[in-house]
Amino acid sequence: SADGKPADIYRVVADKVTGKLRDLLCTGGIVTKVTTNSKGVKKEEPYYDEKDMARKWLELGLDRKATKRQVMVLPYGGTQQSCREYTEEYLKDRLAGGAENPWGDDTFTPSVFLSRLIWDAIGETVIAARDAMAFLQKLARIAASEELPVNWRTPAGMPVLQAYPDHKARRVKTKLGDSIMYLTLQEELETLSKSRQASGISPNFVHSLDAAALQLTIHNALKEGVCEFAMVHDSYGVPAQDAAIMAKCLRRVFVEMFRDHDVLAEFRQAISDLVSEDKQKKLPPLPPVGDLNINLVLESDFFFA
């Protein structure tokens, strides 16, 4: 950050959520939900009181862990549903640590309430990541509409193919001893799953860039004389005497990757080369580019932990 200290985006989002909770103490109302009875009759009924929810969450208090996983997984395809699930897990962890549940035995409803605020706060903070995710999903959907798998090359030159097939449930009757059993098997079809192609592209694309960074960092470090590595995804390990060399190499590789490659433009071109001329006209434009000076990464003490 500008003051020379590690920037904590999880804390930033948590603070925004706390601000929203304080606002709701004055402006909150009754949130309703629609239920359907056994006869198919729909009925609107009260779900929760926003003022009461806000007061209890403020009394419980939010730390950076309240938003950490929700923010962390966003570039990997995080959704509102996963946001709610992680919020409930956070609440359960707090309760397991000795906190008293202001809602009795209920952890679902308060997680629904808070996750909506967290999701909005993430959207106000991590704007570019959400735009990029939507861009990738649109491209994957267009390719899938022509039954085309998505393929691209990473900055390290590695080819990547994403092809999630549709499935059909097949029920099998079998006998085990004296019992008749029915098993359901998922049979792969020749058609592509459009929903899985879209939902999978964001995490797979980001993981492919992580893999490229790891590959290029090892290649770079080998040229600097480092020959022992313990590498898992985005966790880089070398002998202590080589740590300073590794720190320089991984920063240099990151800068070169994103200085020499417009990864979103390259991905868009890869899709354009696959689809028909008619679909090419429907490809979304590139998301706007920010003003980050990528070379500043070389001077960042806290870029990589």
Predicted segments with their positions:
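Conserved catalytic core of nucleotide polymerization and phosphodiester-bond processing enzymes
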Residues: 1-305
